[in-house]
Amino acid sequence: MARTVIAIVDDLFFASKIRGTAEQAGVAVSFPRGIELLKEAVARDQPSLVICDLNSQRINPIEVAQALKANERTSHIPLLGFFSHVQTELQIAAEQSGFDRVIPRSAFARFLPQILSGTE
């Protein structure tokens, strides 16, 4: 079964970078545009990873983490959030809400191939 990743990303540059890197790695990726679409995608795809831009305006990343971690069918899915390195309060909030990993945007970009392939 192919690795599947769901990405919650508003920034078109990062979405394009994720899509291109996923294609090269043979990883299926989807970009739901709302909380209901996210829930449907998670139930349908049972992703290996959910990536979330912690600055997303479309979907509240803190609510995403709380909802996924509270549901026994989705609580095992790893959540990775990325943020601007100066937003330490956002990092703390994400960690407290259930994100398994929270990394600066620069590290996310640098290690994207490994993150998507599950080797990092």
Whereabouts are the PLM-identified features?
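Acidic, metal-coordinating helix/loop segments flanking the phosphotransfer/catalytic sites
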Residues: G34-L49
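Conserved phosphotransfer microenvironments
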Residues: C52-L68
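Conserved phosphotransfer cores of two-component systems
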Residues: K69-S75
